[in-house]
From Swiss-Prot:
A UniProt-annotated Pfam family: GIDA_C_1st
Protein name: tRNA uridine 5-carboxymethylaminomethyl modification enzyme MnmG
Keywords from the UniProt entry: Cytoplasm, FAD, Flavoprotein, NAD, tRNA processing
GO terms under cellular component: cytosol
SUPFAM superfamilies attached to this UniProt entry: FAD/NAD(P)-binding domain
């Protein structure tokens, strides 16, 4: 092999959701990229639940898509059931979710990776990283191959010192059927990085042919179906299926309570903290002892497999207990388990040791993304991966990094939460984490981010053309409607009364008419002189939201502008906080530990006071004047 085989601009380690997006983003922006994975066949694998999207998570997928990422495309190629969650609520909290065929999803991701220019794949376990002082310069495989690169993105998922637990049985693994990255974990622990343990879990898988669906409630998908990608088409979705809903029983809870002493969660065997919002069934039975049943979503794992994912009964109880509790569930009386549920513990690193670019502060050129940063979920991992891959490529070219602000994207909220507050439990995205969620809707992710993505080199010509055509259509339709006026006596006013039963008392612009709670775009388009309107549902939605929520959006924009002063005030990396007179010991220690990159980030550190921020601003201004002088 020639020397060029081993030299790259960016190396990405791990090919799950974070690694796939990282490698694609780096290569799309021009970096010669190597994706190292222990098994090419598991690229893009959905290790736990077979679904993409949901509350907060769907927002992240739309943002990934707006920035040219892969996840939404793969979801559209694999989605076998589609739903819009919170459809009856406001647009800020509506979210798209799809049940996905695991095989189709994995195939879609692999196809995109294999088709990406400047991106090579190599199958190898990575045992160590190469360093020159405090700078990363490559990776060493289990077989001793040395790959060189000035930037490395580590997306190890649950593989770093991973340990599976099923009852008292425990063994080293990255996930069931895959080896852990034990050597790499040990080497990383030797560096100046703060490491801790987290845990997650998964339910037993069931042979769907052994279930009694007549005892369950059918949950069909939505019609018409949404799409995940802004440039997706529901006509390209695979065949659709139903999910089902059932419940645990009092007998289920009795079985679990009687076996708690055998649970690694309660015996002290597991040290890592589990996800608060996706607890195991034994955790739910203990924490919500007053409940007689818990809901279970019965989700098919694909069109051509027998496996069912029983969402809601993640467990690490011994297998004999798993079998008994599964068969106590309504409709599961004859269930055959194909794979046991288990918990897995793994290493993660305190994300407060990261810059906003997701580069580690301790090691130049080393970027972390995904569960290694303390998050849980495919969507959270993929969003971080895209950002880390982009910034790794920019690092190599000597360009400044880019991270969205909290008011620009849920990705910005995610990163800021992690690097400012850290986490001691798996972090999951919710819409409630964002202060500006009316601005950060699923439907406008492209309007927020696609132009930025184009400037960064992430967005290709086809997506850019589609985006511009959509924006022009929205502006054109808003302009058309704003030019139309209805009066009690003119023809349009009479049509409005006859069609909609709305009697006008004065001259009214059609835009103002749409602001009324009882009217929407679709209703107005039934008026002969107004309709039929645009036939693109995305354009119609943008027109309606921009009109109905204009007042709220304008007020939130003004608030964001006020906050921007602090967000734009950078703090030098080598800043000496001890030189700021008047800071309390507590505040000083927090600033020295977190090393915020902007005054805005410093403001969000728990325990930070307005007085401390004022002192910080005064000192920064004094430094600026001294430099000028």
């Amino acid at each position: 092999m020639t020397d060029s085989f081993y030299r790259y601009d960016v190396i990405v380690i791990g090919a799950g959701h974070a690694g796939s997006e990282a490698a694609l983003a780096a290569a799309r922006t021009g970096a010669h990229t190597l994706l190292l994975t222990h098994n090419i066949e598991t690229i893009g694998a959905m290790s736990c639940n077979p679904a993409i999207g949901g509350i907060g998570k769907g927002h992240l997928v739309k943002e990934i898509d707006a920035l040219g990422g892969a996840m939404a495309h793969a979801a559209d190629a694999a989605g076998i059931q589609w739903r819009t969650l919170n459809a009856s609520k406001g647009p800020a909290v509506r979210a798209t979710r799809c049940q996905a065929d695991r095989s189709l999803y994995r195939a879609a991701i692999r196809q995109m990776i294999e088709g990406q220019a400047r991106l090579n794949i190599f199958q190898a376990e990575v045992d160590d990283l190469l360093f020159e002082g405090d700078t990363v310069c490559g990776a060493i495989t289990h077989t001793g191959l040395h790959f060189k690169a000035p930037a490395v993105v580590l997306t190890a998922g649950t593989f770093l010192a991973g340990k599976i637990h099923i009852g008292p049985t425990q063994y080293a693994a990255g996930r069931m059927g895959d080896p852990p990255a034990t050597m790499l974990a040990a080497r990383l622990r030797e560096r100046l990085l703060t490491v801790a343990r987290l845990k997650t879990g998964t339910p037993p898988r069931i042979d769907g042919r052994t279930l009694n669906y007549t005892a369950m409630q059918e949950q069909p998908g939505d019609a018409p179906r949404p799409t995940m990608s802004f440039i997706g088409n529901s006509a390209s979705h695979p065949p659709q299926v139903s999910c089902w809903i059932t419940q645990t029983t009092e007998r289920t809870h009795e079985i679990i309570r009687a076996a708690l002493h055998r649970s690694p969660l309660y015996s002290g065997q597991i040290e890592g903290t589990g996800p608060r919002y996706c607890p195991s069934i034994e955790d739910k039975v203990v924490r919500f002892a007053e409940k007689n049943s818990h809901q279970i979503f019965v989700e098919p794992e694909g069109l051509n497999v027998i496996d069912i994912y029983p969402n809601g009964i993640s467990t690490s109880l011994p297998f004999d207990v798993q079998l008994e509790l599964v068969r106590s569930i309504r409709g599961f009386e004859q269930a055959h388990i194909t794979r046991p549920g288990y918990a897995i513990e793994y290493d993660f690193f305190d994300p407060r040791g990261l810059k906003a670019s997701l580069e580690t502060k301790a090691i130049a050129g080393l970027f972390f993304a995904g569960q290694i940063n303390g998050t849980t979920g495919y969507e959270e991992a993929a969003a971080q991966g895209l950002l880390a891959g982009l910034n790794a490529a920019r690092h190599v070219r000597g360009l400044s990094s880019w991270t969205p602000r909290r008011d620009q994207a849920y990705l910005g909220v995610l990163v800021d939460d992690l690097i400012t507050h850290g986490t001691n439990e798996p972090y999951r995205m919710f819409t409630s984490r964002a202060e500006y969620r009316l601005q950060l809707r699923e439907d406008n992710a492209d309007a927020r981010l696609t132009a930025i993505g184009r400037d960064l080199g992430l967005v290709d010509d086809a997506r850019w053309a589609h985006f511009n055509a959509k924006q022009e259509a929205v502006a054109r339709e808003c302009g058309r409607l704003s030019a139309l006026w209805a009066t009690p006596g003119n023809a349009l006013g009479r049509e409005v009364k006859e069609t909609l039963g709305v009697t006008l008392s004065r001259e009214t612009n059609i835009i103002d008419l749409m602001k009324r709670p009882e009217l929407d775009y679709a209703a107005l388009m039934r008026v002969p002189s107004l309709g039929p309107g645009v036939d693109d549902a995305q354009v119609a939605e943008q027109v309606e939201i921009s009109v109905k929520y204009a007042g709220y959006l304008n007020r939130q924009s003004e608030e964001i502008t006020r906050q921007q002063r602090h967000e734009a005030t950078a703090i030098p990396l080598e800043f000496d906080y001890a030189a700021v007179r008047g800071l309390s010991t507590e505040v000083l220690q927090k600033l020295q530990h977190i090393q915020p990159q902007t005054v805005g980030q410093a403001q969000r550190i728990p325990g930070m006071t307005p007085a401390a921020i004022s002192l910080l601003l005064v000192h920064l201004e004094r430094m600026r004047r001294n430099r000028v002088a």
